[in-house]
């Protein structure tokens, strides 16, 4: 965006040393004829926005990360299901629902990242199939459509998410809080006057929706001497 020649060497070195996650996001967005009906002892599960499936204990989590480190899709899957229409019915026609399955997955598969283009629909079948085991009403007759995005797809469509990394970089001690994205730099500001950062690589991280942008706007207001009317 700027050009390395316009930045000091100490800054470009920090950029090059920034660490990205080795895994990204695999997403299956599904349109349904009815809401998901989970088989659960606790009825509040069918009112929840987020439901986590497949991570029954610490061994499942370790298996998940081992498989990703080996360049393999997680199988059996361990993922989060989001239910947006439970909170905002306007996201679907009356009586219909949408869900999103979010599964961590490696960008660089065994055989190369391009392999995602070959297997993503098959892996989406596995993810949806597992959901059907927990919610029998999720079946071909109730699925109106779906849209699948592999880590490779995400990296193609969002330049902030290198290798599909929705967190905007590793959440290690040296890349968190005031150290994000780089130690010793003024938060949300760059060496280029008037150029600010507000993507997932800034504090707090990706997934904290609007927080990065809100913090960035506050920094801009401070620099420009603009009253923060939104903070009143």
Which residues does each predicted region cover?
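Active-site-proximal substrate-binding core of FAD-dependent oxidoreductases
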Residues: 222-232
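Short glycine/proline-enriched loop/turn "hinge" motifs that connect secondary-structure elements
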Residues: 89-96, 185-190
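Conserved FAD/dinucleotide-binding core of flavoprotein oxidoreductases
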Residues: 31-33, 93-127
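A conserved FAD-binding loop/helix module that cradles the flavin
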Residues: 200-221
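A glycine-rich dinucleotide-binding beta-alpha-beta segment and adjacent secondary-structure elements
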Residues: 74-82, 137-203
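Mid-domain catalytic core of redox enzymes
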Residues: 1-92
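Hydrophobic, well-ordered secondary-structure elements that form the walls
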Residues: 30, 101, 127, 131, ...
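Flavin-binding catalytic cores
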Residues: 35-36, 65-74, 117-156
């Amino acid at each position: 965006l700027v050009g390395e020649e316009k930045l000091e060497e100490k800054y470009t070195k920090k950029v090059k040393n920034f660490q990205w996650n080795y895994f990204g996001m695999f997403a299956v967005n599904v349109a349904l004829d009815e809401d998901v009906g989970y088989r659960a002892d606790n009825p509040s599960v069918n009112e929840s926005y987020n439901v986590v499936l497949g991570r029954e204990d610490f061994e499942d989590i370790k298996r998940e990360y081992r498989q990703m480190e080996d360049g393999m899709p997680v199988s059996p899957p361990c993922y989060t299901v989001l239910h947006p229409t439970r909170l905002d019915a306007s996201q679907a026609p009356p009586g219909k629902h949408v869900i999103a399955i979010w599964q961590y997955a490696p960008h660089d598969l065994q055989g190369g990242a391009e392999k995602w283009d070959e297997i993503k629909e098959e892996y989406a079948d596995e993810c949806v199939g597992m959901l059907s085991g927990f919610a029998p009403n999720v079946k071909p007759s109730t699925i109106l459509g779906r849209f699948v995005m592999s880590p490779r797809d995400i990296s193609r469509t969002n330049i902030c998410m290198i290798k599909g990394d929705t967190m905007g970089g590793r959440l290690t001690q040296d890349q968190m809080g005031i150290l994000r994205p780089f130690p010793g730099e003024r938060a949300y500001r760059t060496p280029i006057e008037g150029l600010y950062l507000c993507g997932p690589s800034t504090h707090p991280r990706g997934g904290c929706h609007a927080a990065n942008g809100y913090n960035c706007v506050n920094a801009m207001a401070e620099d420009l001497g603009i009253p923060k009317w939104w903070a009143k």
